[in-house]
Amino acid sequence: SCYTLDALTEVLEWNNQGTPADELACLWLAYLRWYRGMGFTPAAHAPFSLDREIDTSAPLTAREGPGQATLRALESGEMQTVAQNINPDALVTGALVRSCAFGFLPVAPERTVVLLAARAAALTHGHPEALASAAAYALLTRDVLAGACGSEQGKKNSIADSVRRVIDWCGSIPAEEAFPADAAHTREALVKALALQETEPTPEAVAEHFGTDWLCYTVLGIAVWNTLYCSARISASGEGLQAGLMRAVSADSDSDSIGAITGTLLGAHVGTLGDTQPLLEKLRGAADVRAVADRYIAQLGQRP
């Protein structure tokens, strides 16, 4: 996610200097630098780009179980697309978890977010449902953040309202090149999460209702369930947030990804309310992540 956001920052840097930039090219180069930063050797024919500030961060370039589909795509040295992809059946979570950053884009057209998230997902994952789940996550992040930062009425909207809107989107995807198939599995997972929002997502309940696979739409559904359950129980002081995050990473599935998605959505919803700041400071690499965010905000014309 941090490398995705840094790529979008680079696009803004070029634009602010009066030079148009190719978003997808910046994203691909960022992922190749991340691949290189983890100690892998890119293909000889892969394009090279100079290091950026993010590449000096040890926590953000630590090799912590990167997915095989992601590594295979980046190892090829060829830019993958929706139409031609080295991983046509890839349904795991590598593309999903890095897509939240597209929800931070301050653009009015929803279609811009959807297409960019889908095409960025296709850089490593080719299955249509992987593209759809990535776009759904980006849209959900965007909607939750808009509610938290908008009018007082908007702030009263629950995460459940945002989930319902994304479910509607999943059921109305137009037939176009970005999505060679519908988002039926992603929609089903979100519908199930919404129906279960009053049920505690214990590891046993998660296994019963979602199973233990590591598929992108399953992981998104579990994370949204955790988010819905936790968000309704966080006090004004932030009490309950840590318990919700601990619950998220206890699932017998891709718990890292479930925790990351849950944390992103809860963070977008509640911000740094109450006593959450000490919790944030405990995170490894927190300063590095904040620096990435500050550079993005600075390019938007705001002071960090």
Task: Report the location of each language-model feature.
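Structured, active/binding-site neighborhoods that engage oxygen-rich ligands
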Residues: 1-304
